[in-house]
Amino acid sequence: MALAGWLSACQPQTENKNPMQMKVDRFVEVELTTDLGHLSAKEKQMLPLLLETAQLMDDIFWTQAYGDKEALLASVDDEATRAFIHLNYGPWERLNNNTPFIPGVGPKPAGANFYPADMSDEEFEAFKAIDKTSLYTLVRRNEAGELQTVPYSVAYREEHQKAAELLRKAAMLAEYEPLKNYLNLRAEALLSDNYLASDLAWMDMRENKIDFVVGPIENYEDARYNYKAAHEAYLLIKDLEWSQRLDRFTALLPQLQQGLPVSEAYKAEQPGSDSDMGVYDAIFYAGDCNAGSKTIAINLPNDPVVHLEKGSRKLQLKNAMRYKFDHILIPIAEKLIASDQQTHISFDAFFENTMFHEVAHGLGIKNTINNKGTVRDAHRDLYSTIEENKADILGLQMVRQLVEMGELEEGALMDNYVTFMAGIFRSVRFGASSAHGKSNMLSFYFFEEEGAFSRDAETGRYRVDFEKMQAAVDKLARRILTLQGDGDYDGAQALLAEKGFIREALQADLDRINASGIPVDIRFKQGAGVLGLK
């Protein structure tokens, strides 16, 4: 870390830099690594096999996102442009509305490379194939120019067969039976396009030190119809200590539910804790998850059949969070948080806020108390934003309860409050149009109204008032839980219309951050060499 800082200090001044290099430099490079000392000899032998499998997923994703990677790289002659192509998996800038950054390249097709570029919506509508909307088929033209589907197991036969072979070799080394079973079933899934059995097997893993998310999973890359799954892989090493702490907090959910600052009717439901949560360090990202900004938490599988039968698993990627905290959140806090409160910006608080947000989704109420059906149905298009806000605020409320229960250190609560404020600036610096962005603005302006923080007009810095913040968290928790329990759509709409957007004064502060050269995100130096496996 220190070396990276020293090197950047020796770089030529910004005005002398290649504009493309400036784009690359907005993503700070970090080494993706962790301590592998607690792995057994056989577990260490599995890693190169899984890394090779992940690289195959990366190769496939390139063809899905763009097409011919090597031809594209060969068409440019400067290293900075090549690096930016690698980062974006193509010639379009992902964090800038997919704007082309190479002369002569047209707009990115909304359906990426999953469909023929010249296919119209009407043609797709008229196309009668029953598997045209499958997650695991490409749409192509046959020799007569007509649309046809091609299953992934056929389109990527060579890569899938090689990946299946590697997964089976890794399974032979696995000492933990559920991991062995999962790897074998995932190998079969790549050859059959049927992922259900392997998704269910993945849910059965609890004691594994190595986890491997692999295959066609998320459908965001298909921005045209959201039908097609893109290939990716995460190779993860479990953080045993933090995972155990999280298990303990999850076990306390019934007590935490009873401690919510609302009347009995709004907390009568049993909190959901069926889903498994774990803490991991990532040691390799491949394909979809490595394109553009980097994920710091995973919630899988996506299959609703698995949700009904076994729930889902939430994986917090601690080292990726740490890199974002060190390189993005800390520099933002240095610019916007009162100097004497910067000691309250801590990684533990950042990590707790993120994790308790996830745990807090299980608290509160899922069904209205006045026969309006589920909260989701009653709040319709506003549900995600209000639910995100509930998770943020009840997460902070949980920290206070856990301190009072003796589960967390006394005095840490101020760290959580000040770090939460800095986290708002980090998450909305490029806009607040997402559900989570609107939720952050709702919290920000509610807290401002309650005097939970103040802004020094002279320095442009923010200061948290501990007592008022405690009161404001309880008050907002009451408001949100009541809106949910009453199924009050109009009330939720009015609250968001008033507070769910960035106002001018805050925008000016965000502009100040963005003009100061603080990184947009991280990029990884990763692989066997970085891990000391070569």
Task: Locate the predicted segments by residue.
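Long, well-structured alpha-helical subdomains associated
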Residues: 396-492
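Short, hydrophobic/amphipathic alpha-helical patches that form generic packing surfaces
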Residues: 52-62, 87-94, 137, 166-169, ...
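Extended, compositionally biased alpha-helical segments that mediate assembly or anchoring
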Residues: 477-534
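Fold-level signature of zinc-dependent metallopeptidase catalytic domains
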Residues: 20-32, 37-49, 130-377, 381-385, ...
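N-terminal accessory alpha/beta regions
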Residues: 62-146
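N-terminal mature-domain "stem" immediately C-terminal to a signal peptide or N-terminal signal-anchor/transmembrane
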Residues: 14-98
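C-terminal motif of bacterial Sec signal peptides marking the signal peptidase cleavage site
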Residues: 7-9
